[in-house]
Amino acid sequence: MLKLNKINEVKKYVDEWKKEGLTIGLVPTMGCLHEGHKSLIDRAVKENDKVIVSVFVNPTQFGPNEDFDKYPRSIENDVDLCNKAGVSIVFNPDPKEMYFHDACTYVNVENLTDGLCGAKREGHFRGVCTVVSKLFNISQATRAYFGQKDAQQLAVIKRMVRDLNFNVEIVGCPIVRESDGLAKSSRNKYLSKEERVEALVLSRGLRKGKELLYGGIRKTSKIKETIENEIKKSHLGKIDYIEVVDSITLEPVENIERDVLVAIAVFIGKTRLIDNFIFKLGE
């Protein structure tokens, strides 16, 4: 396995692989890899001849009051995990390598980024789409792998790929959870022992909402109210949003007549956590 930090170095290997007719899987990450990331990497290794894992804490997707400087980094552990998983290249560039000092070109997906996380994190998805576009160009990936936990990101990337005719297949992978139900996240490292226990209100709230949906309730307001009541049982929890939206367009719905995404964001102490599930009508 190779650990590279220069774009041209990655391109050199990609060109060789393409000449040989090999398929390439890309797993874009911000590092601090956990079992959720590993599930993406394992699938990429299984489905492609070569796999590139990018480890890059992307400054352009963090707002001015967000946790860029504090975001957990563990490159040695990340490289070890990737090596054991059968990854071909770990791409770990510096921000100066990814962005020219006078860069003025960005990729922005409209409408889908207006709600959910996009409503509170101005510029976040512009940063995500720009860096992912660059990674697509650098890697020339056959397939790229994203987790369902970042459901809005997955929907936005799919739309960007469609609209801009990127020649890459987007593969969405299921949420990986701890044994007690908490969705795996790099930000879980921020949680104190007490906060870690309180964080379970996210998965419990979603489970309550899911029970109503599978029990035949179709009124969005009832679903949201039930989830809200469960989350409010935590004295450390502060709700950012609870939304029920169309699973494709991400537009809010009042009565559930098609597949929907039920998504929540909650602050546990100072740590913002997200979780979600997709309800498919007819299942």
Curated annotation (Swiss-Prot):
Compartments where found: Cytoplasm
Active site: H37
Keywords for the protein's UniProt record, in alphabetical order: ATP-binding, Cytoplasm, Ligase, Nucleotide-binding, Pantothenate biosynthesis
Cellular component GO terms, alphabetical: cytosol
GO biological process terms held by the UniProt record: pantothenate biosynthetic process
Enzyme nomenclature, EC number: 6.3.2.1
GO molecular function, one term: ATP binding
Keyword Transferase: no
Domain of life where this protein originates: Bacteria
Further comment: The reaction proceeds by a bi uni uni bi ping pong mechanism.
PANTHER family (UniProt xref): CYTIDYLATE KINASE/PANTOATE-BETA-ALANINE LIGASE, PANTOATE--BETA-ALANINE LIGASE
Subunit note: Homodimer.
Function field: Catalyzes the condensation of pantoate with beta-alanine in an ATP-dependent reaction via a pantoyl-adenylate intermediate.
Database matches in NCBIfam families: cyt_tran_rel (TIGR00125), panC (TIGR00018)
UniProt name for this protein: Pantothenate synthetase
Source organism (scientific name): Clostridium novyi (strain NT)
